[in-house]
Curated annotation (Swiss-Prot):
Protein name (Swiss-Prot/TrEMBL): Small ribosomal subunit protein uS8
Coiled coil (residue ranges): none
Biological function: One of the primary rRNA binding proteins, it binds directly to 16S rRNA central domain where it helps coordinate assembly of the platform of the 30S subunit.
Record Gene3D superfamilies: 3.30.1370.30, 3.30.1490.10
Subunit text: Part of the 30S ribosomal subunit. Contacts proteins S5 and S12.
Alphabetical list of InterPro entries matching this protein: Ribosomal_uS8, Ribosomal_uS8_CS, Ribosomal_uS8_sf
Source superkingdom: Bacteria
The entry's keywords: Ribonucleoprotein, Ribosomal protein, RNA-binding, rRNA-binding
């Protein structure tokens, strides 16, 4: 079956694996998924990103993070904002603060995919891909 929104698919796979407390999850590799995974790793939501396979069958393996003795997921919620049917763009002044700065908005800018904090520092806006907190 064709996947029409790979970003939503990626977020759903991470959300489901995190709720079931899996150690890692596999995601089809693309430039966008690599960039989003890198932002999630830099922001401390996942511990490690690695690649397996070759060519078209390359997959990203994301090692998820948990906290406490009951292994509470670090990622509480992931919400897709800009969708294929309704794109959401914001300038650098209009970039959202997720949970008053506790969460992260992942933004696709002309300078690459980055967190809302990095986009504000660089003074760029772009497409708001998702919220993570």
């Amino acid at each position: 079956m064709a996947n029409h929104d790979p970003i939503s698919d990626m977020l759903t796979r991470i959300r489901n694996a995190s709720q079931k407390r899996h150690e890692n999850t596999r995601i089809p590799a693309s430039r966008m998924s690599r960039s989003i995974a890198k932002v999630l790793q830099n922001e401390g939501f996942i511990s490690q990103v690695s690649e397996e396979g070759e060519g078209v069958k390359t997959q990203l393996v994301l090692e998820l993070k948990y906290s406490g003795k009951h292994r509470h997921p670090t990622i509480r919620s992931m919400k897709r904002v800009s969708k294929p049917g309704l794109r959401i763009y914001k300038n650098n002044r209009g970039l959202p603060k997720v949970l008053g700065g506790l969460g992260v908005a992942i933004i696709s800018t002309s300078k690459g995919v980055m967190s809302d904090r990095d986009a504000r520092k660089q003074g760029v806006g772009g497409e708001v891909l998702c919220y993570v907190y």
